[in-house]
Design a protein with these regions (language model features):
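Hydrophobic secondary-structure segments that place a key small or acidic residue at a functional site
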Residues: 49-160, 164
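Generic structural signal for small/hydrophobic residues in well-ordered secondary structure
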Residues: 3-5, 23, 29-32, 64, ...
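Residues embedded in well-ordered beta-strands within globular domains across many folds
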Residues: 33, 109-111, 170
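"Rare, low-scoring activations can occur
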Residues: 143-212
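Structured segments of extracytoplasmic/periplasmic soluble domains
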Residues: 22, 26, 98, 185, ...
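Structural beta->alpha junctions
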Residues: 4-14, 46-50, 122-126, 171-179, ...
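Membrane-proximal extracellular/periplasmic loop immediately following the first transmembrane helix
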Residues: 1-45, 50-60, 142-144, 165-167
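Internal alpha-helical transmembrane segments of multi-pass membrane proteins, especially GPCRs
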Residues: 214-217
Length: 218
């Protein structure tokens, strides 16, 4: 579902803390995160350089750990930045390389939809969360849309995009074998809150490249 093209879906409420707590009570689940995403983001600039086609994520404080990210340089977001709607950003290495020489990212100001965001950190997926690529087909499966990722706090997301956008969820499970069962349980929890039962929009568990490392995308 592409919000930027189709608008906000009807009857899909914003996910809340109680739902995350319910998800964390699933025996197979280790951690969980709710986030928002623009799958194809334009309007991202540093001076005269632009990044088109990358992703922008509005993340909660659990996202980096749940998805296996580690800091390369700088720091992650702190609670004051979430609470005070600070315009700060994290870049993955691909996005960082689009704008800066290595090591020159921190403290620089990029623009997202005309709003200034200060880069506070550069992140990458931990090696244990990266897939082993054995063929060109697998490469395109995992990396064909890897044009860079910019992360901002979920609290400041409406400054750039829209209020009350539906979130996505990701969980980490104890073992890869737990993914299917846990994913279905999370899917049920999230869909219980959808008010418009006739809508074509619902949450559905989806296997992504992290499935080999105990992650499940919702």
């Amino acid at each position: 579902y592409q919000i930027e093209y189709e608008g906000l879906p009807q009857g899909v409420p914003v996910l809340n803390k109680s739902q995350k707590e319910e998800i964390l009570e699933i025996p197979e689940v280790v951690s969980a995160s709710f986030y928002r995403m623009r799958d194809y983001a334009d309007g991202i600039y540093y001076q005269d350089k632009s990044m088109d086609g990358g992703k922008v994520l509005g993340i909660d404080s659990d996202y980096l750990d749940t998805c296996g990210y580690q800091l390369v340089r700088g720091r992650g977001f702190n609670q004051k930045e979430y609470a005070n709607f600070k315009k700060v950003a994290l870049l993955d290495e691909t996005a960082a390389n689009s704008f800066f020489e290595k090591g020159e990212e921190l403290g620089k100001t990029i623009e997202i939809k005309g709003e200034p965001f200060v880069v506070v950190g550069v992140v990458k997926k931990s090696d244990e969360y990266e897939p082993v690529i054995n063929s060109i087909e697998e490469y395109y499966t995992y990396y064909n849309d890897e044009s860079g990722i910019v992360m901002i706090t979920d609290s400041v997301w409406p400054v750039v995009y829209q209020y009350d956008e539906p979130q996505q969820a990701v969980i980490q499970t104890k073992t890869p074998e737990d993914m299917s069962q846990a994913g279905k349980a999370v899917q049920q929890i999230l869909n219980e809150q959808i008010q418009n039962t006739e809508t074509s929009v619902s949450y559905k568990a989806e296997d992504i490249m992290e499935k080999a490392k105990g992650l499940q995308q919702i």
